[in-house]
């Protein structure tokens, strides 16, 4: 499942960072989920908890923040949000975009000029935005 692969990458990132910083414990992790990716937060959280088990990150607080998807037309410079056009997507299209966000260009066009030449300004992908660690001695 795609969410498990994402969770695995997040966990590896967190544990690598903690090791580099000499952490004795990971206390909290903040993860940004891009709206365009349409990730199932509950599955990612469950997977992270399972993958953290037996590590210095076991029991860490996991916080998710959704980043709104914003697009900008390269033709007319119009900016718009996914929520303004999301009703045009059926479940198959949502699934296609979930696995390969770049295909959004095949299904969306600028609401102002109709161009398919646009950039995803934000709201794509998944990334670790913060890691709170504890070092020996409680710092």
Curated annotation (Swiss-Prot):
Pfam families: HypA. Involved in the maturation of [NiFe] hydrogenases. Required for nickel insertion into the metal center of the hydrogenase. Signal peptide: none annotated. InterPro entries: Hydgase_Ni_incorp_HypA/HybF_CS (IPR020538), HypA/HybF (IPR000688). Zn(2+) binds at residues 73, 76, 110, 113. GO terms for biological process: protein maturation; protein modification process. HAMAP family: HypA_HybF (MF_00213). GO terms for molecular function: nickel cation binding; zinc ion binding. Keywords: Metal-binding, Nickel, Zinc. Belongs to the HypA/HybF family. Ni(2+) binds at residues 1-2, 98. Monomer and homodimer. Could also form hexamers. Forms a complex with HypB. Gene3D superfamilies: 3.30.2320.80. Disulfide bonds: none annotated. This is Hydrogenase maturation factor HypA. It comes from the Archaea. The lineage of its organism: Archaea, Methanobacteriati, Methanobacteriota, Thermococci, Thermococcales.
């Amino acid at each position: 499942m795609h969410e498990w692969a994402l969770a695995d990458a997040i966990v590896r990132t967190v544990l690598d960072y903690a090791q580099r910083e000499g952490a004795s414990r990971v206390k909290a992790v903040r993860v940004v989920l891009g709206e365009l990716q349409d990730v199932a937060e509950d599955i990612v959280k469950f997977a992270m908890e399972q993958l953290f088990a037996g590590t210095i990150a076991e029991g860490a607080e996991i916080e998710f923040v959704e980043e709104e998807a914003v697009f900008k037309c390269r033709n007319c410079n119009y900016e718009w949000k996914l929520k303004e056009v999301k009703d045009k997507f059926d479940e198959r299209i949502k699934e296609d975009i979930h696995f390969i966000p770049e295909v959004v260009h095949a299904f969306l066009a600028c609401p102002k000029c109709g161009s398919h030449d646009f950039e995803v300004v934000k709201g794509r992908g998944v990334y670790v935005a913060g890691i709170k660690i504890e070092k020996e001695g409680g710092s």
